[in-house]
Amino acid sequence: VAAALLLVGTLGFGARALGTMSVAGAGSIDVAVIQPSIEQTLKWDPARHAQILDIYERLTREAALTRPAVVLWPETATTIFLRGDPELLERLRRLSADIATPILVGSIDRRDGPRGQFLNSAFFLTGQGITAKYDKIHLVPFGEYVPLAGLLGFVKGWAEFISEFGEGDTQTVFPLPGAPFGTVICYEIIFPELFRGFVIGGASFMANITNDAWFGETSGPWQHLGTLPLRAVEQRVAIARAANTGVSAFVDPAGRIGPTLPLLARGVLHQRIPLRTSLTLYARLGDWLVYACAAIGLAGAGIAFFRRSPATC
């Protein structure tokens, strides 16, 4: 009975909170996301780089027609080192200058020069060039790094390139005028404590850039999308999602999934999103309540165990 009352109470509180939630007084901005729908088999082909970049530029110029505050490209939109290719960097700088709009570009990078570790990064570009960068912190095990490499080093022979990524160490909040924002890359969206760090660091909305082409036409992209409402509700923050092959979407602070682009479609998605105005209880306190509940539960189990233990002499 107690468990049922707790469940009903929790659901009732959540429904009431959603019904009374208001964004009155909050500012808002227009955001555009690009979904180029580049097949995984073509994405990393050097012979396709020019063609793929042309697709991105065309979609970006189309997105700029509605005058968004920022245009979001997906994870690893450029599969060559952006900072190591002056011609590519200059082309993107000119593109941002031409449309008078910052662009968030997912790209591969290197740490400390041409022989450094690979990084999965997001670059904030304006007409002045790169003004900020975020390096992915939570890497995909056996995809971007090998856990326990000392014991499982033989795995590197199976995936020599993608298993040598380094992890970032800074939760960058991008300096979009009037609307600073953070981004999580790919499956980083499943980590509430990482997401929380961007919000308490000043992000007024969040972006999620990803390349879900790996999943193909499976339920994977939809399951991945399904984690966004959890993060949105925890922080009462809007999320804009740019996915290579889908599903690109917008999620409002109440966790409602808004406009989406179909899986494998190519196009542009626009939405006016509210900016965060306050911090939730979870944003302020973090996971301490979870730890407290776990401690109370363990203590209760221990007390019950010792009370039931038969007396011995």
Task: Walk through the language-model features, giving the residues of each.
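Enzyme catalytic cores with a strong preference for nitrogen-chemistry domains
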Residues: V1-C313
